[in-house]
């Protein structure tokens, strides 16, 4: 328990102390990935993240107003709503989640229809994204240290899972950020609330649960193997 707290404090301090260069690498890699996917980056904008962690530089892409959104994006919205509705009728287990996503899509379309000429500042997206990302990166060691160091039979393996989850969170954030920027560029704010929920908050939770499940599965498997070996030898 003491080791878990020490590791958590050390990693959180390092993430806070090197926040600016970490976000710069994040921005450069995100811009590079966007370029590979032909997503235009029109510039970079300094954004404030938290007191003591500023300024960060966020990549900027052009975001169309709702009146400028093409027919393809509008048809994709309609197909998505119909598809989610059909799936919700068929599968009761995930019906509540799908209904929530449908409500987000309908609300987004209604608000965009009322404010067709509203211009969204892509720099605001970058600022919100980095605020959420830095909060996750600073707090993540506290969760992973308690989860992995307590349940892993070997301390080295627990430390490995902690570092791997931190690195994966960084890489996963780049991919999700570029995906969200692509949605903004091609469809404006039409899909954005739904996408933000899926690749933002829910995405962070899913990745943490994924790592926790894998680590527990491996630790449990090794314990069963050790018990089987001990039973066979005795």
Task: Name the predicted role of every residue range.
Residues 1-234:
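Hydrophobic N-terminal alpha-helices or hydrophobic patches in metabolic proteins across all domains
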